[in-house]
Amino acid sequence: MSGEQRKKEYLAKAREAEEHAQRTPDRHEKESWLRIAQSYRELAKGQ
């Protein structure tokens, strides 16, 4: 997989995590999903 493909995949996973965060009413779960999204965005930047 090329670096550009990997970056797109990480960004897609970040968006999915952000969608999960918006759907959950639980504050702690929301914070967890947002941390996951941030981690994927950081991975995408590193590519």
Language model: regions and residue ranges:
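Terminal alpha-helical segments
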Residues: M1-Q47
